[in-house]
């Protein structure tokens, strides 16, 4: 199965997919730089009178609901409609949907305008969308339960898409297949934007590789490996230094590293 992950990385480097991102103001620069680091081409286009047409030119669409304004909400409806009409992968990052009821209503409406290819959130967000009790604090998940796989599979079947829940162990499921990614570092929780960057990477990989399940696993593994390497560099235990090293290490993840250090449990 690791062969699929290396093929996904190769496809990303070869195709340089254009990722149309409508994301939050806190992490927009982080998302753009992470995409550039792995070889994708980010476009942070969110003007409502531009997104319908632009989404149809992209390799994938990334919708991040972190600081959702009314203008972004309208743009997201138009963008997902355009992307779905062209069969372009749509990646949803349902930031804070477990804490803010409006987010769940927005996600439901987005589902009327188009379809999701991947839903990527933390465990609390995934459980909230799946209709399960979730422990959250703002945008952060307090859940570390053993029902994460069940929540992912349930949500995947409900939406007919791939679902990924990030945490100490990342879970990826599509209603039939599932895996656990055991790489990563606590340092990723000490900077703003790691989750958003991971979501952006999922969009990048999905824009280059047809198997959305494999693309999602490859993206999250890339993020986790880069985090491990960033922590291991000089000063990597300091949040500011770690952030800078993280972007550097994203650019250095290759097939050999995935083969050597990737810890993926296929279920």
UniProtKB/Swiss-Prot annotation:
Uppermost EC category: transferase
Pathway in which the depicted protein is active: Cofactor biosynthesis; thiamine diphosphate biosynthesis; 4-methyl-5-(2-phosphoethyl)-thiazole from 5-(2-hydroxyethyl)-4-methylthiazole: step 1/1
Gene3D superfamilies per record: 3.40.1190.20
InterPro entries in the cross-refs: Hyethyz_kinase, Ribokinase-like
EC number(s) given by UniProt: 2.7.1.50
CDD domains for the chain: THZ_kinase (cd01170)
Pfam families: HK
Keywords, ordered alphabetically: ATP-binding, Kinase, Magnesium, Metal-binding, Nucleotide-binding, Thiamine biosynthesis, Transferase
GO molecular function: ATP binding; hydroxyethylthiazole kinase activity; magnesium ion binding
Annotated positions binding ATP: 120, 166
Alphabetized SUPFAM superfamilies for the sequence: Ribokinase-like
Annotated GO biological process: thiamine biosynthetic process; thiamine diphosphate biosynthetic process
Cofactor entry: Mg(2+)
Binding site for substrate: 44, 193
Reactions listed under catalytic activity: 5-(2-hydroxyethyl)-4-methylthiazole + ATP = 4-methyl-5-(2-phosphooxyethyl)-thiazole + ADP + H(+)
Domain of life of the organism encoding this protein: Bacteria
NCBIfam families for the chain: PRK09355.1 (NF006830), thiM (TIGR00694)
HAMAP family associated with the record: Thz_kinase
Protein name: Hydroxyethylthiazole kinase
Organism: Desulfitobacterium hafniense (strain DSM 10664 / DCB-2)
């Amino acid at each position: 199965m690791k062969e699929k992950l290396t093929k996904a990385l190769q496809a990303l480097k070869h195709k340089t997919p254009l990722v149309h991102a409508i994301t939050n103001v806190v992490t927009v620069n982080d998302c753009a730089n992470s995409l550039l680091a792995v070889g994708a081409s980010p476009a942070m286009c969110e003007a409502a009178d531009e997104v319908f047409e632009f989404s149809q030119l992209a390799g994938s669409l990334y919708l991040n609901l972190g600081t959702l304004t009314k203008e972004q909400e309208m743009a997201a409806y138009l963008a997902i409609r355009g992307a779905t009409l062209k069969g372009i992968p749509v990646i949803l990052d349902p930031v804070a949907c477990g804490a803010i009821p409006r987010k769940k209503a927005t996600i439901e409406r987005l589902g009327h305008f188009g379809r999701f290819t991947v839903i990527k959130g933390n465990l609390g967000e995934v459980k909230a969308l799946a209709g399960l009790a979730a422990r959250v604090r703002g945008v952060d998940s307090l859940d570390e339960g053993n029902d994460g796989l069940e929540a992912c599979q349930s949500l995947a079947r409900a939406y007919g898409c791939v679902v990924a829940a990030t945490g100490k162990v990342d879970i990826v499921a599509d209603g039939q297949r599932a895996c656990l990614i055991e790489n990563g570092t606590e340092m990723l929780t000490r900077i703003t934007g790691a989750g958003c960057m991971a979501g952006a990477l999922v969009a990048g990989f999905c824009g280059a590789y047809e198997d959305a399940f494999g693309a999602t696993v490859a993206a999250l593994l890339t993020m986790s490996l880069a985090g491990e390497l960033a922590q291991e560099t000089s000063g990597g235990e300091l949040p500011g230094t770690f952030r800078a090293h993280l972007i550097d290490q994203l650019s250095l993840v290759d097939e050999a590293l995935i083969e050597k250090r990737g810890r993926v449990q296929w279920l």
